[in-house]
Amino acid sequence: MNAPAKFSTSQIRSDFLAFFEGKGHTIVPSAPLVPGNDPTLLFTNSGMVQFKDVFLGAEKRSYVRAADVQRCLRAGGKHNDLDSVGYTARHHTFFEMLGNWSFGDYFKKDAIAWAWELLTQVWKLPADRLLVTVYHTDEEAFELWRDMIGIPESRIVRIGDNKGAPYASDNFWQMADTGPCGPCTEIFFDHGDHIAGGPPGSPDEDGDRFIEIWNLVFMQFDRQPDGTLVPLPAPCVDTGMGLERLAAILQHVHTNYEIDVFQALIGKASALTGIADLENKSLRVIADHIRACSFLIVDGVLPSNEGRGYVLRRIIRRALRHGWMLGVRQLFFSKMVPTLVELMGEAYPELVVAQETVARALLAEEERFAETLDAGMKIFDDVASRSQEIIPGADAFRLYDTYGFPVDLTADIARERGMRVDMEGFEFAMERQRETARAAGKFGGGVALPADLVATMAPTVFLGYEAQDADALKVVALLKQGRPVDRAEAGDEVIVFTDRTPFYAESGGQVGDSGQLSGTDVSIEVADTQKFAGQFHGHVGRIAEGALKLGDVLSGGIDVQRRGKTILNHSATHLLHAALREVLGTHVQQKGSLVAPDRLRFDFSHFQPITAEELAVIERKVNAEVRTNHSVEVHNMAMQEALDFGAMALFGEKYGERVRVLKMGGYSTELCGGTHVSRTGDIGLFKITSEGGVSSGVRRIEAVTGQGALDYVAEEERRLGEAANLLGGNSTEIVDKVRALTDRQKRLERELESLKAKLASGATADLGASAVDVAGVKVIAVRLEGFDAKALREAMDRLKQQLGDSVIVLAGAAGGKVALVAGVNGGPTGKVKAGELLGHIASQIGGKGGGRPDLAQGGGEDGPALATALQGVPSWVKQHLG
């Protein structure tokens, strides 16, 4: 029998797409690893994610047949293969899924025929090495395989409900407990009887002999709440085939790590680490993880301590730790990127575009972790030496919290030593920290609307996009001291809920409105407006006069000036976000914001400090868009329509079926429920006041706008003028004058150091003569006025050269503090230790210190005790000399 043809991974990709394009399919680009239409999903983990809304009927596409190669990630949440990566033949964090789709067009007959044609005619797989499974009641699929394709019944395996419930089967797919579902048929490749394992459905099915290569799902039912299956009017097809495991078969190897892509990456890792054994598991881990990390960064994820960014950090640090295990102490991981681009850049041009960003982000994380890895490993070794089989959860949390060791990294290390981590203890420590954080961040001491009250209320109607005041606002709920009441009196602190309101409730970073509510006999000063249960506007304030009761009808007006300043800052954050992405790269994503009347604060993902030059460019670009005076357009549309419109959605924000889109010319388009200017020119002026780091991978810019920006510039000019006056010149001369001052300061400091050295030299000449002989050893213990630690050390060196065998203690006093230096030279070092001597002296003057046997340093408080301590040195030395 002739061996099947051999295909490269790139060829397999292009063959698949070309084949289905020839069958009338639209070729759809891979969706990002970060799902754009499902904020509840951590990562794209299958090919069907981008088509989910199509299958659910919530979205229509311009085609009914599609094919794609989808990049996927399984390293967090429900689908997490991280612990297995590197230790098994086929587990990966990142993988590619080949898929073809029918949305109410072709069904089982064509799907099965085309799958067989591609496998056996294009890729030349021997038909007698292929085996298929079908759902045990799917007679149609069984007959198609037997009669149309011609597979013997002995190689068609019926799989029943093998997971303990009706339709709970490896061969029955369902999206959820209800909704679209249906049987599937799977195609397996037989590696041969020289490999252990049995066919699917047998007791030995978990062996490696029979490998699933293609799953064809036939969505033909709508599962009802009572469990019954109702036929769908337009059945669909969803297929998935793992590229890596298919490549292993078509390249005549047994494990995925032996295919061309992985062999090239493992070879690069081998060259960087100096490890020649290409089957080394750590090299496999590094090769796998560079793909996952790089494509996550391509799709806008950066290392951080939460969410997707934390998963990325875990993967990076796992790879770095495996490099450390191989003895690598230099930076290496980011150097894998060019090889990856060579291998996958043609299939994914976005990887080529983002190559520099990827390498810089990985290098920054590599440098950061290198600082703590050594220290963290020492802590782990210490904990492991004190533990038997279990690493205590509290210690695992300390490694995570202090040294940045993700718990699965700690578990990985523990497993290699035959140990495990107490995960319950770790989760307890983690939850305790979360509770502390939640308690610190709760508004109003954790005030919440009772569930029974929420059930009786309709969502607040917000009038504030069009109006700044309104009448006929009915009081529908009233809280006093966090509890529902029917009535409140003058002086009471309350939270008032009305059916409608012009007051904006804090959300999306924008602070809530303040203002006034009033009725016939009542006036309420509103200090803030907060959103409760995501849909009710609570007016937080104090009853100034009168009494308020449920059912009262009020008029309300916001603080117009405060809102006016706030909207300038909110609109500016949109322009800033766009400018950051333009200047720094599309990896920049909003991580948080504060939009207040007096300033704006914008947190965003970026892996290094922003240079002064970059800040200047960003500021100029924002002000250019302000001067362009774009009209700010508001569009209300369906979520998918908004995404197609180009609007940016922020992960973590909750969006309804319809969303509000803010468009500022062609520069910025974002989903936003906040209040904004009518034209960008209303912002007036944008001025950055500060930039800095918030946490690893997150930067913060603060800025002011409008009159606040003008006031800021005026204050800066005033300070500049004041500085110029102090320097005796005008503002244009400040730089030259400051430079001259710093040059003069450096010159004077050098002269001062020279004078101190001369003083020390002269002092030592005199001190040598005052040495006391103790058992043949010269002992000096003196106080020197004005000597700092450096001058004391220089004096110590000269005295050692001058005296030979000696014990020397020098105390430099200045400003109520004492610097101590103790030295032991020559013969006495065997019995007299400088560290012990200095500790003895420092303890008498309220200080501390230590060092080597021949030299120690410390300090303490100046006072009478110093003289006593120095006088006692000769007797202490005599005692230790014996």
Swiss-Prot record:
Binds 1 zinc ion per subunit. Belongs to the class-II aminoacyl-tRNA synthetase family. Its cofactor is Zn(2+). The keyword Aminoacyl-tRNA synthetase applies. One of its GO terms (biological process) is alanyl-tRNA aminoacylation. It is found in: Cytoplasm. It comes from the Bacteria. It catalyses: tRNA(Ala) + L-alanine + ATP = L-alanyl-tRNA(Ala) + AMP + diphosphate. Zn(2+) binds at H570, H574, C672, H676. Keywords: Aminoacyl-tRNA synthetase, ATP-binding, Cytoplasm, Ligase, Metal-binding, Nucleotide-binding, Protein biosynthesis, RNA-binding, tRNA-binding, Zinc. One of its GO terms (molecular function) is aminoacyl-tRNA deacylase activity. NCBIfam families: alaS. This is Alanine--tRNA ligase. One of its GO terms (cellular component) is cytosol. The keyword Transcription regulation does not apply. Catalyzes the attachment of alanine to tRNA(Ala) in a two-step reaction: alanine is first activated by ATP to form Ala-AMP and then transferred to the acceptor end of tRNA(Ala). Also edits incorrectly charged Ser-tRNA(Ala) and Gly-tRNA(Ala) via its editing domain. Its EC number is 6.1.1.7. Consists of three domains; the N-terminal catalytic domain, the editing domain and the C-terminal C-Ala domain. The editing domain removes incorrectly charged amino acids, while the C-Ala domain, along with tRNA(Ala), serves as a bridge to cooperatively bring together the editing and aminoacylation centers thus stimulating deacylation of misacylated tRNAs. It comes from Xanthomonas campestris pv. campestris (strain 8004).
